[in-house]
């Protein structure tokens, strides 16, 4: 995917909530409230972020099973795993999935998340390529 893709505020916020919930052990509702307020989400963006974040958290077991089947890899870094959980939720369980947008945004979230975690650019590109491959198989 092009690095020129701009992440939607709703998906960026949902990704942050998923990371805080699973990586830091935060309560999802508290993480969501703080993240949505910090991002200034309102209206449709707020509703989309809520649906994606809570959905990805609620479907973790199913998503993790699918990831294990599709990934063919035992260890997955936190940035890629959160992007996969979010992308799979949107692809598999959303009422109106926008498949291309879901994959594209998950790929960009994995890249941005890996860079934010301090990974070198090459590893961030590898994480985004991995997420793209797994979601295309889904």
Where are these regions (language model features)?
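Class I Rossmann-like S-adenosyl-L-methionine
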Residues: 1-138
